[in-house]
Amino acid sequence: MTQADIWCTIAAIFFISIDYVTGVVKAIMRDNLSSRKMREGLGHKFAYLMLVLVAWFIDEVNRHIDLGLPMSVFVCTVGGVCLIELTSILENVTEINPGLKNAPFMRIFVQSTSGKHGAE
């Protein structure tokens, strides 16, 4: 594994873990903790980890057999998983502490449909 692979792995595990923990805290605070939902959540996290593992393996194969891939499948997959998890973490955190929803620093996470990349 390269240094980048190690950091990607750490990032994926970090975001997946934080999402799970914030989801459990949110459920506890809403008095809605369910073992069925926890099992489903763990299943989803397991699926993400398997997807990351498969992406890493594709990159390893590509190092030895030219598959013609222009970029790292692993890095792209980890980036996607981390962004999905970040969205869920933000949803959980703003339900745990509703005051954060309108906090000025949260604006950096708001999706914009206008501006230089928006429809004009």
Predicted regions and their residues:
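Membrane interface segments of multi-pass transport proteins and intramembrane proteases
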Residues: N32-R36, R63-P70, E95-A103
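Alpha-helical transmembrane segments of integral membrane proteins
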Residues: D5-T9, F46-A47, M71-V81, E91
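Alpha-helical transmembrane segments of multi-pass membrane proteins
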Residues: A12-T22, Y48-W56, T77-S88
